[in-house]
Amino acid sequence: MGKCRPSGDRRPQGSLVMIMNSQEESAMNFNEAALKLHEEHHGKIEVVSKVPVKTRDDLSTAYTPGVAEPCRKIHDNKKDVYKYTAKGNLVAVVSDGTAVLGLGNIGPEAAMPVMEGKSVLFKEFGGVDAFPICLDTTDTEEIIKAVKYIAPC
């Protein structure tokens, strides 16, 4: 036989035993926890209203017909967009998925969890509302154009 096995070892002969250090075990635990978190919550971000919309009056004030008045004010003075909307506290986290953390070129779909994570960091540590936007192009000019269209000056 020539194989040295401790007495009482019930594993089948030829079974693989993995020995990991605590750092590797920790990484595996974070990986499993991250998959569970993302699956259970379908990502890490959501849009939540700052104002109640529980009654008909609430709805009429937050949406139509009441919303027309701030629209008119912004139409008359474009700078009022910062007074009447969240625009002054919004940023876009834009990626084409080609240089994602230590993952490299993983594409826009696979980049979304990282961009959501960055959005969470903006909110938690800076109080800034951030939206992840993953573009399906690697053309620099197209990316610039898309960002300009998203946020006109």
Which residue stretches match the model-derived regions?
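N-terminal ligand-binding/catalytic initiation module
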Residues: 25-153
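Residue-level detector of intrinsically disordered terminal segments
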Residues: 17-19, 27
